[in-house]
Regions:
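Extended ligand-binding groove/face enriched in aromatic
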Residues: 94-190, 197-201
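Low-complexity, Pro/Thr/Ser/Gly/Ala-rich linker/spacer regions in secreted
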Residues: 28-31, 369-385, 507-525
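Bacterial N-terminal signal peptides
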Residues: 13-24
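Extracytoplasmic
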Residues: 377-512
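Short, composition-biased motifs enriched in small/polar/acidic residues
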Residues: 512-587
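CBM-like carbohydrate-recognition segments
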Residues: 31-80, 84-115, 119, 127-128, ...
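Active-site cradle of extracellular carbohydrate-active enzymes
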Residues: 180, 184-188, 195-248
């Protein structure tokens, strides 16, 4: 299903050159595809090693120690996956958003720690942004209601206020207070409910007044019940307050929040880095000195320093740390044999790692690649749906046998309750073909094939391929609707499902090319042009321009946009008078 491209020329005022927006594209002779490849390999290795299908959760360690990761590190692992979805414009990993949601839904949404709930709230709002599914936002608001109960004015010290870190009321920590400000500001921007903003500002104001050094701008880690402030130094604390400041700046437009974020970032890059041959790298301690929760800390710190840098790309001192950290991760902290990363981003490498340190590395590599340059594409045809990017229910990921497509396949499923959902987006209603690429090395297998919740093929046989590294195709015909459809492959012993089956991909045939029509062109503010066009939910689109003569390379206006409904829009900020030709293409 190839995309029909639409382009037009528009005279706009005020074209800002790309170099001013993204200086590293102009001064660094590095192919963006290299960074995207590194980010992809890191995230794919992370998923292959840590996703535990029969638990619908993440393992704690590699090699596995038999335990599962914790609540808050699962939230960051989920965010790392969504970084991959965003970076690739929805071409990869999209179905896994729901897989991770299902895993936490089965485990329960509340925690004994308010800071952990803040991170899960942020992850839920991110899932809503990428999918448009309000169930994620509804769960975020329900969870935030629990967070607000942690506010207390009876303890601690001379100026009493702030959120408890935990429900046992042992301390008040930056993790909970900056986290609540950050999450509340995000909820306000998505719901318009001023109660979220008011609470976020209340928490932020208290913490800024009482727990930030007014001279150095270091953030205090926590305050115990006696009122004693504990000034542990971690990138995490500064990163969270940077994130809260940026979110509140976006929610209110007040420059004071941006100024605070820059002050705090100055402390971070001045005191929480270590020198390497690539430049200063974010640092919370050595592989042995940074233990426990510390393994996760640099991930969110990097995320929010990057968010701040995106607000003002003249802050090259931030970019120096961001790029050096990404380069050192790949060159100094990567175990090239197993594709895992050490706690210390400056190395040395480690053989045994945990999920937290690995997802922190994935966060940094994916955020940097997205900011550095455009995604070159997955190379996967639009009508080919990779099983490893689908929504998984109690099935495992694997990348061992034969010439599989994409970055893996699903495996180890032969029990009731196991299934995979492909989210298929069509341009036409009517007959389509579904071709499943699979391996059945243990003999003949069978599965239920359901379409939009109806068992279209209750006991479809998959003939033996004779070996796990030999693949075959099983094709059926069915009717699909215009827009999103769900094609499920299910193990149900009552309907005759049997034996093991590795599922590689689904190719959908019989669809027509998509015709994109620009539906409106507007100027929402001086110097900003907005294009709107029709979409199919779940597909991704790339808006590009080139110069007035209609020659030269096409330049991406924004990263690929994942449609969350029947229409989408993109803004192009311009400076001096210029004529531009625009088009919307398949990324």
């Amino acid at each position: 299903m190839k995309l029909q491209r639409f382009w037009l020329a528009i005279l706009v005022r005020g074209a800002a050159c790309a170099c001013a927006l993204l200086p590293w594209l102009c001064c660094i002779a590095q192919d963006p595809a290299t960074y995207h490849q590194q980010a992809g390999r890191a995230l794919q290795s992370f998923l292959l090693k840590f996703w535990k299908g029969n638990a619908q959760y993440l393992r704690n360690a590699y090699p596995s120690d038999g335990t599962l990761t914790g609540y808050w590190t699962y939230a960051h692992g989920w965010e790392a996956v969504m970084d991959g979805v965003e970076r690739t414009g929805g071409q990869q990993y999209s179905g896994l958003i729901e897989s991770f949601y299902a895993g936490q839904n089965a485990s329960g949404w509340t925690s004994g720690y308010y800071d952990d709930e803040c991170w899960m709230t942020v992850a839920l709002t991110r899932a809503y942004d990428l999918t448009g599914d309000t169930k994620y936002l509804n769960q975020a608001t329900a969870l935030y209601a629990d967070i607000t109960t942690g506010w207390d004015t009876t303890c601690c010290g001379p100026s009493r206020g702030g959120l408890w870190w935990d429900k046992a009321h042992t301390q008040k920590a930056t993790a909970a207070n900056a986290g609540a400000a950050l999450a509340g500001a995000r909820l306000y921007q998505r719901t318009g409910n001023s109660a979220y903003l008011n609470f976020a500002q209340q928490v932020y104001s208290y913490w800024s007044a009482n727990m930030v050094d007014p001279t150095t701008f270091q953030i205090c880690d926590h305050m115990n019940t006696s009122g004693t402030k504990v000034w542990w130094r971690f990138t995490y604390n500064e990163g969270l307050m940077i994130g809260a400041s940026v979110e509140l700046y976006e929610a209110t437009g007040s420059p004071s929040y941006l100024a605070a974020a820059n002050n705090i970032a100055g402390y971070m890059i001045g005191h929480e880095v270590t020198p390497t041959s690539y430049g200063p790298v974010l640092y919370d301690g050595s592989n042995t000195g940074c233990g426990g929760d510390c393994h996760e800390f640099k991930g969110p710190a990097y995320r929010y320093l990057m968010r701040l840098y995106a607000k003002d790309t003249t802050k090259t001192q931030y970019y120096t740390v961001l790029k050096a950290s990404a380069d050192a991760l790949w060159s100094l902290a990567l175990n090239a044999t197993s594709i895992v990363f050490s706690v210390n981003w400056a190395g040395p490498i480690q053989s045994s790692v945990d999920q937290a340190q690995d997802n922190a590395a994935c966060i940094a590599l994916n955020r940097f690649a997205q900011q550095y340059g455009p995604y070159p594409g997955s190379g996967i045809p639009r009508n080919q749906y990779e099983a490893e990017n689908a929504t998984l229910h109690n099935v495992s990921l694997e990348a061992i046998y034969g010439t599989f497509t994409g970055w893996g396949y699903i495996a180890a499923w032969n029990a009731d309750g196991q299934s995979v959902d492909f989210n298929v987006n069509c341009t036409t209603t009517g007959p389509h073909t579904l071709a499943f690429r699979y391996a059945a090395g243990a003999g003949n297998a069978s599965r239920v094939i359901a379409v939009n919740g109806v068992n279209a093929f209750p006991n479809r046989g998959f003939s033996s391929t004779g070996a796990w590294d030999a693949y075959s195709t099983n094709t059926v015909s069915c009717n699909l609707a215009t827009g999103p459809n769900t094609v499920s492959v299910i193990y149900n012993s009552a309907l005759g499902s049997a034996n093991y089956l590795n599922l590689d991909n689904l190719v959908v045939g019989g669809d027509a090319p998509e015709v994109i029509r620009i539906t409106s062109i507007s100027l929402p503010s001086p110097g900003t042009l907005r294009l709107a066009w029709n979409t199919i939910k779940g597909r991704s689109y790339q808006v590009q321009f080139r110069n007035a003569a209609g020659t030269g390379a096409w330049i991406n206006v924004v990263p690929p946009i994942i449609a969350t409904g029947p229409a989408a829009s993109a803004d192009d900020t311009v400076g001096a008078s210029a004529q531009r030709y625009y088009r919307i293409v398949e990324p």
